[in-house]
UniProtKB/Swiss-Prot annotation:
One of its GO terms (molecular function) is nickel cation binding. This is Urease accessory protein UreE. Involved in urease metallocenter assembly. Binds nickel. Probably functions as a nickel donor during metallocenter assembly. CDD domains: UreE. Pfam families: UreE_C, UreE_N.
C-alpha cells in the first residue's frame, strides 16, 4: 500500500501515478485508507486538519509517486434565488444549521437533504438535485494549507 504524506499545490502539468476521486466529506479525512477507481489501495497520512481540494497533488512518502485529488461528483442540492437578498437569506439559514455550503454569487449548493430543500423552497428559492462535484466553504476557522 502506498502512503501519501505531503501536500503539493495543484499543478496541471504534473505527471501523476494515480488519481483519487473523493467526495467533499472524504476530502476532510487527513488520515484514511482509500481505494482508487482502478483498485489501488492508498493511505493518506497528512497533517491533521488538512482539507484537500480538487486538483491537489500528494507526494508518496518515498517520493516515487504522485496522486492527483479529484472532486468526486455527488448528490447535491443547488439553490437559485431571484434576488441577491433572497440568496443571502438562504445562506444565513443554512449557516445557522452549520451545513457545509458551496457559495457563489448566483447559487448555493449543499449535500442533498429533503428538509433543507423544503425550507429553501418555502423561502422562495428554486432548488434542484444534481450530481456534481461539491466544494463547500471551510468556514471561518477552516485551515487552508496552501494558496489556490
Amino acid at each position: 500500500m502506498l502512503t501519501f504524506t505531503q501536500l503539493k499545490p495543484p499543478n496541471g502539468d504534473a505527471t501523476v501515478t494515480f488519481t483519487l476521486a473523493l467526495t467533499a466529506e472524504e476530502r476532510t479525512r487527513s488520515r484514511h485508507r482509500f481505494e482508487t477507481e482502478d483498485g489501488k489501495v492508498v493511505f493518506l497520512h497528512l497533517p491533521r486538519g488538512t482539507v484537500l481540494h480538487d486538483g491537489d497533488i500528494l507526494l508518496e512518502e518515498t517520493h516515487n509517486s504522485l496522486i492527483r485529488i479529484i472532486a468526486k461528483p455527488e448528490l447535491v442540492v443547488t439553490a437559485f434565488a431571484q434576488t441577491p437578498l433572497l440568496l443571502l437569506r438562504a445562506a444565513y439559514h443554512l449557516g445557522n444549521r452549520h451545513v457545509p455550503v458551496e457559495i457563489t454569487p448566483t447559487y448555493l449548493r449543499f449535500s442533498s437533504d429533503s428538509v433543507l430543500r423544503a425550507m429553501l423552497e418555502q423561502l422562495g428559492l428554486e432548488v434542484k438535485e444534481e450530481i456534481l462535484p461539491f466544494q463547500p466553504e471551510l468556514g471561518a476557522y477552516g485551515q487552508h494549507h496552501h494558496a489556490h
